[in-house]
From Swiss-Prot:
Residues 184-368 form the Macro domain. This is Histone macroH2A1.1. Belongs to the histone H2A family. One of its GO terms (cellular component) is nucleus. It comes from the Eukaryota. Changing Q225E: Reduced affinity for poly-ADP-ribose. Residues 154-177 are annotated as: Disordered.
Length: 368
């Protein structure tokens, strides 16, 4: 009996150009459309790969933002309205798609800042929270010091002058107590109701703003890295105030927030929050969301305009950094969308390690 022949499939040339480029979008079809459209006399093979990669990236970016919009509107499916919200609430995408009409996407009303409650009178504090002098002011200070025969190290004096002028322009700003270093603002995002989120590289205890957030436990201990720095900078007075609070309330429940004076800190207030542990992933993110909401609600009761957060949850609470950052940013955005008005105008994320900075910069882009 004759042996059956084995059929060996040919493997050469079986992979498409898209798979070789690591893309889901069809590179061959894009190349064919480029040639058919007569956009140029010669179309290189690499141009189709590059264009397909850009289209794939933009599609993924819009879908992610549209998914966030659908989630915020309590919808389980993405519709054209969510795509419209995603594109128009992102500064770069809005510029890219200027003049583009999204069918069935509806319209996005433009709300003038003066019509937003408390926005007009609080706009003078837009950039007075941090002791970060403008580049031109720093150059002028260095030039003045050089002409006066002083060392260039006198930049701190210009910082003090900048902070004093900012406090003069805004009566609600915290008066400078001591000169501190300038801060580097790495990225920012303005929400649709006017609040601005900043990612900052610096020291939380040297921030000049209305309040700083202290992640703690049920006893409001200063044992953590952030807590130890806050305790050392604030002084013994904060211990007495915390002990007084604990004698009345016995403990700070998980997700709850309490507020004390800043004492020797440049900030007027310290908002203590009992941050949850990442023991159960299903409930930990909800608990962290509620923690952030409680902190912002308490800040609003004190008419706080500027508040600074460290990287909450990613230390002793064992949250993965990207999950903690995503949860915190979404919680802040959802809080401002759920209330009629808020005294908070600026939220700073004061970070010192490069990993946290990279994570917050990446997540801030996707916040709407």
């Amino acid at each position: 009996m004759a042996k059956s022949k084995k059929i060996v499939a040919a493997t050469s040339g079986s992979r498409s150009r898209s798979s070789r480029a690591g893309l889901a979008f069809p590179v061959g079809r894009v190349h064919r459309l480029l040639r058919k459209g007569h956009f140029a006399d010669r179309i290189g093979s690499g141009s189709a790969v590059y264009l397909a990669a850009v289209l794939e990236y933009l599609t993924a970016e819009i879908l992610e933002l549209a998914g966030n919009a659908a989630r915020d509107n309590r919808k389980t499916r993405i519709n054209p309205r969510h795509i419209q919200l995603a594109v128009r609430n992102d500064e770069e995408l809005s510029k890219l798609f200027t003049g583009v009409v999204i069918p069935s996407g509806g319209t996005l009303p433009h709300i003038w800042p003066a019509l937003i409650p408390n926005e007009a009178k609080d706009s003078s504090t837009a950039s007075a929270s941090f002791n970060a002098p403008a580049k031109s002011a720093t150059v002028k200070a260095l030039a003045a010091a050089k002409s006066a025969g002083k060392k260039p190290a006198a930049v701190s004096s210009s910082s003090a002058a900048a902070s004093s002028s900012s406090s003069a322009s805004s009566s609600s700003s915290v008066a400078p107590k001591k000169p501190v270093r300038g801060f580097t603002i790495l990225s920012k995002k303005t929400l649709h109701l006017g609040q601005t989120l900043y990612v900052v590289n610096g020291d939380l205890t040297e921030v000049r703003c209305d309040a700083v957030v202290h992640p703690t436990n049920g006893t409001m201990s200063f044992a953590g890295q952030v807590g130890g720095a806050i305790r050392a900078a604030a002084g013994a007075g904060v211990d007495a105030e915390v002990n007084s609070y604990m004698s009345e309330h016995s403990q700070l429940q998980v997700t709850k927030a309490a507020i004390t004076s800043g004492h020797n800190l440049p900030s007027k207030w310290i908002v203590h929050v009992h941050s949850p542990n990442y023991s159960n992933a299903a409930t930990a993110t909800d608990a962290l969301t509620q923690t952030i909401r409680n902190a912002l609600t308490l800040a609003d009761t004190k008419s706080i305009k500027t508040i600074a957060f460290p990287s909450i949850g990613s230390g002793n609470n064992h949250f993965p950094k990207h999950i903690a950052a995503q949860t915190i940013l979404q919680a802040i955005s959802a809080y401002f969308m759920s209330i009629m008005s808020s005294s908070i105008k600026e939220v700073y994320f004061v970070l010192f390690d490069q990993e946290s900075i990279n994570v917050y910069n990446a997540e801030l882009i996707n916040t709407n």
